[in-house]
Amino acid sequence: AVILLKDTTQESARIGVDLVIQGDPRLERIAGRVMRKEEIEGGRLEEVWACKEAMYKAFGPGLDFVKDLKVDFLSKDLISGMGRKWEVRRKGNTVVVLGPV
């Protein structure tokens, strides 16, 4: 989902949101094509994929998932990507990433 908001300067701000179900077997199949080695080795595929999808929804198309969408974990609930911060939320077996925050 992409949400367009008006900020105080009257310019549009794009927000990206993505939801991933933990344990989705497709993540292991696509990880090598869309994630960096260190992102895969971190063991947080759901959060990485949800963040990359949220960034792509906010700033794509034309972005490469490996080259352009690098994910770094700042804390359990905060990810850095594209020079911005992205919030991670978990509920049951669902991971939601939204931002930038």
Regions found by a protein language model. Name each.
Residues 1-101:
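Core catalytic alpha/beta fold that binds nucleotide/phospho-ligands
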